[in-house]
């Protein structure tokens, strides 16, 4: 298994190919490799982790969508949680299920992650160059860092009428 080399971060695919010992045409924008299936996800499989370069790994799930969710969770266990993922689907059930189990702060639906994550007037996310990854990624916020995060605020707090809810109201059937 390999590890990320500093001289391969954010370089052209041509330079990346040269570092790996082969050549690609000058007009290519990235290198794509097949990752296979879930059997190729793990710390010992370099292509299943974050690369920070012009290399795209394509993994295929087989059978039910649940298998894709299992693979996604395995990849986040290897590559780190919190940042983002994307789904190209029109199936609202698939999108919802991904949203319920993906340990990420943003999910791009039918849009490129690299542009969508940083915010856009076409997706409602505030523009940023700094993305919070929540406690999944060791951050305090899980949203795009924007102007509101740099503004000092002062809370003026006054006593409120105290209306203590009953245990039944708080815990419902779990209180029995």
Question: What function would you assign to each model-found segment?
Answer:
Residues 21-176:
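Conserved C-terminal structural/oligomerization subdomain of aldehyde/semialdehyde dehydrogenase
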Residues 1-17, 45-53:
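Flexible, acidic loop-helix segments that line cofactor/substrate-binding pockets
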